[in-house]
Amino acid sequence: MPINAELHCHNSFSNFHVGDDEPPYDCDVSIRDQLERSHNLGLDAIFVTNHNTLDGYRQLLEYKNDHAKFKNINVFPAEEITTDTGAHVLAYGIHDVISPGLSLEEVIDEVKKQGGVSSAPHPFSLLDALRGGAKKCDMVEVFNSNNVDILSNARATEFALDNNMIQVAGSDSHVLSTLGRCVNVLMIFYLL
């Protein structure tokens, strides 16, 4: 059964520090607004990938469960983890926070221990990118709607093809208007 899924988005619980002396700020999208837009776009699933926290996922799931209007939107746990080099890794299906500041290898190991799946977001963006380290992830984000240069997504696609990796797209939504900009059609199989 195919589902339309948003694989890379943030809400007001995202915890990204610009500098050590700065308070965390990443986006101001509310839980209600995130679900409302997902509903209006006809999304079947949303993976909340807040920076360095699972907060926002739990609150989104609770709000969804309290409002019948959103009952058909599946909400899944995920996190965007900042490695020791500043590069990011997306972790899907985890249930415990993976602390920032770990090496890429440590992050990947922890994702696997939790039974999750890893993805390299914006692997060839101008700043804080995994580049060749993306090979260690399960998937590669070949299209990130926030990449400002035209070559980053093309390089990510070429990299994924050369390394025979699963390709996904991400809205990387930090504002409400970009939620659902990149939707992945996933095939879900139910085991009896």
Segment roles from a protein language model:
Residues G56-F76:
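Short acidic, glycine/proline-enriched helix-loop-strand junctions
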Residues M1-Y25, E36-R37, Q59, T83-I98, ...:
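Charged catalytic cores and adjacent phosphate/nucleic-acid-binding surfaces used
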Residues L61-A68, E105-S119, A156-N163:
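Surface-exposed amphipathic alpha-helices with a cationic face
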